[in-house]
Regions:
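Long, low-complexity, charge-biased intrinsically disordered regions
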Residues: 1-327
């Protein structure tokens, strides 16, 4: 949603990284946490001594949450409100700079708004945390972010490279689609070895991540692969490699946010955004349970927000019923 707004409103965005974030949190007042004495310091303490932690440390389960609670306090001091829809999204309506948004991903903070507003917010944030300023957002959470011709484009070249580095993938330059049209994967009795199953699960997981962030068109193929995470065979492994080959052969593609309309930043409070949604369904694609597959996508002024492909939880008795379930 924020990337779509960046494209529609032409927001400026920077990325900052909080140094030593998990060392900054405070423990609850009624909680005492202890740790073993590090080996290099054991000679300075009595046997069986332990150290009481005054601050959170890396490795403690509570560290991430305690930093998030600290971040909440800082956001409140900076007059940012937390979104009710997302606990890691903060926003502020400023009289001078208009709408400003901060997105937190653990210790990575993205600041969005006008250039002047973003710079002012960044300077104020640096008063609370010791941060690394990585400049204008070019990459975020493993995604390469490109701006061109009024649009934003997300790609994941590093993840694509891992397909050839981590898997025994035989490149096939002829593959131009993620799956053979109309094909369906079936259960098999000749299942993969435990080692190959680990490879299959790892590869399918990477494809799921790729599908979510930058390649929504492989959603239906990845859904098919995900059905056999506990009992895949050689046909399923070949299908997974086919999707990988398709992604490598079309590495220039990605998720593009190209709005059909644009809005000036100062008019965002009165701009009427248009949300479109589309759904579709096949009929009885699963030959065993006769289940149908639903697909849908939603757009904000032409910028894709969400896509999904899933098997329906019930058995539809007609094409019409399958279409209604998809809606």
């Amino acid at each position: 949603l924020m990337l779509a707004l960046m494209a529609i409103v032409s927001w400026f965005a920077v990325l900052v990284d909080v140094r030593g974030a998990f060392l900054l949190g405070d423990w609850e007042s009624d909680r005492e946490i202890y740790m073993e004495v590090p080996k290099g310091w054991a000679k300075y303490y009595e046997p069986d001594s332990v150290l009481k932690l005054l601050k959170t440390v890396y490795g403690a389960r509570q560290s991430a949450k305690r930093f998030w609670i600290l971040l909440l306090k800082v956001m409140d001091e900076m007059h940012f409100a937390r979104s009710k829809a997302d606990p890691c999204l903060y926003f502020k309506w400023d009289a001078k700079f208009g709408l400003l948004v901060i997105i937190s991903w653990i210790d990575d903070l993205a600041i969005l708004g006008t250039r002047a507003g973003v710079e002012a917010t960044k300077d104020e944030l640096f008063k609370h945390f010791d941060c690394d300023d990585t400049g204008e957002m070019k990459e975020y959470i493993g995604n390469k972010v490109e701006r061109r011709h009024g649009a934003l484009k997300l790609t994941q070249p590093v993840l694509l490279q891992s397909f050839t580095d981590e898997f025994d993938l035989k490149r096939d330059l002829k593959v131009r689609n993620p799956a053979i049209p109309g094909s369906v994967l079936h259960p098999t009795e000749n299942q993969l070895t435990s080692e190959d199953m680990f490879t299959y699960r790892s590869g399918t997981g990477k494809l799921l991540h790729l599908m979510k962030w930058s390649r929504p068109e492989i959603g239906n193929s990845v859904r098919e692969l995900s059905r056999f995470m506990s009992g895949a065979g050689l046909p399923h492994m070949k299908a997974m490699y086919r999707v990988m080959n398709y992604c490598l052969n079309t590495s220039e593609r990605g998720k593009v946010f190209k709005p059909t309309r644009t809005c000036r930043h100062e008019d965002i409070h009165k701009f009427e955004f248009i949300v479109d949604g589309y759904s579709d369904s096949d009929y009885a694609k699963d030959p065993i349970k006769r289940r149908s597959v639903s697909g849908f996508c939603s757009f904000l002024d032409g910028c894709v927000l969400n896509t999904k492909s899933r098997m329906q939880p019930i058995t539809s008795l007609s094409v019409t019923e399958a279409e209604l379930v998809a809606v």
